[in-house]
Amino acid sequence: MAKASIFVLLASTLFCCQAAPVDRHAVSDVHCPLNVKILDALRGAPAGNVALTVFRQGADKTWEKVASGNTNIAGEVHELLSDQDFKPGVYRVEFDTKTYWKAEGRTSFHEVAEVVFEAHAEGHHHYTLALLLSPFSYTTTAVVGKEHE
């Protein structure tokens, strides 16, 4: 049990170091209010080609699909939504983890991983969602930054 806890701690530390932005005002992020970064905890490497879908909750509490994409070789997705399209509200990002693990030759427990969050509750912000992924668990965190000036 102690070895597993140490592994999770080390993997989380590595993931946070990899997910930290080097240049907070990078050209690709200027008009990109929602970024995603995924790390495959088994390989200790970015999880490329993970499909994801972004939904926004309507006034009637139903979910409307507003964007979709796949992670690149670096395990990242940029330009999912423009600043103009990323309106205040509740969002759900659904990651197709089952398909990813099947392509890796592994069986997984979860069909999808989900992150539900409220955007712009305290003014306009930029969000980076980070996902640490293994076949039987996932951990998420978010880096929330102010609007680029």
Enumerate the language-model features and the residues they cover.
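Beta-strand-rich domain onsets/edges
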Residues: 2-48, 56, 63, 138-140, ...
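Extracellular Ig-like/FN3 beta-sandwich strand-entry sites
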Residues: 31, 86-90, 124
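Beta-strand signatures of extracellular beta-sandwich domains
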Residues: 51-55, 92-94
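Surface-exposed loop/edge segments in extracytoplasmic proteins
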Residues: 60-68
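Glycine-centered loop-to-beta-strand initiation motif
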Residues: 70-84, 93
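A short, solvent-exposed beta-strand micro-motif common in secreted/extracellular proteins
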Residues: 88-99
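Short acidic/polar inter-strand loop motif in beta-rich domains
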Residues: 98-109, 138
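Extracellular beta-sheet/turn segments enriched in Thr/Pro/Gly and aliphatic residues
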Residues: 113-149
